[in-house]
Amino acid sequence: MAKKKSKKYLEAAKQVEEGKLYNASEAFGLVKKIDFANFDATIEVAFNLNVDTKQADQQLRGAMVLPNGTGKDQTVVVFAKGAKAQEAKDAGADVVGDDDLVARIQDGWLDFDVAIATPDMMAQVGRLGRVLGPKGLMPNPKTGTVTMDVTKAVTDAKSGQVTYRTDRDGNVHVPLGKVSFTEEALEGNFKAVYDVIAKARPASVKGVYIKHVSVASTFGPSVTLDTTAL
């Protein structure tokens, strides 16, 4: 049974012209205008792609740093030992550890946003797969979070890095910033994300690749973008 929409949502939805494709500037202005959350909500972009995620070469996954940040202070943990652990601390990681950090997470601590690991720690970190995997927190080479360059990884995470991956239906959701951002900042972040997704087109995809793009705030209705204008 479909969840009943709130009165505030329905009022906001009335301001979105049905069937209209908005340019990016119009879309972000409207999303900001119709947001009704009593906090600084996140604005997210959703892509629907013409990909078959059953094919390994058509699964998108990666990371990028948004030019205007995310508006969120990221709590970063690093699994590392010795000199690499010190490097992570110097780079600004919030929590650094090895077996002790693995044990802490096994005991239920998950108060962080990004997890980074050096390759030599992945045997231990792998034991956390069932905990970190479903939350999208498992370190992965494709997102730059399994690396010996922990300084860059921590700096990127603290500077507004976002990750992206296709779900089984070919959708990709990426946060672009907060409602408090200017339209220009949101549009700049969106264009950066759009370029990355467009360039990640698998060679085996035929026909139209990006089928649908929309933006919305946390609780607000979505606004569809005109991809021909991008």
UniProtKB/Swiss-Prot annotation:
Pfam family, one: Ribosomal_L1
GO molecular function: rRNA binding; structural constituent of ribosome; tRNA binding
GO biological process: regulation of translation; translation
One Gene Ontology CC term in the entry: large ribosomal subunit
Function: Binds directly to 23S rRNA. The L1 stalk is quite mobile in the ribosome, and is involved in E site tRNA release. Protein L1 is also a translational repressor protein, it controls the translation of the L11 operon by binding to its mRNA.
Record-linked HAMAP family: Ribosomal_uL1_B
Family membership noted in the UniProt record: Belongs to the universal ribosomal protein uL1 family.
Assembly, per entry: Part of the 50S ribosomal subunit.
Name of the protein in its database record: Large ribosomal subunit protein uL1
Organism of origin: Ligilactobacillus salivarius (strain UCC118)
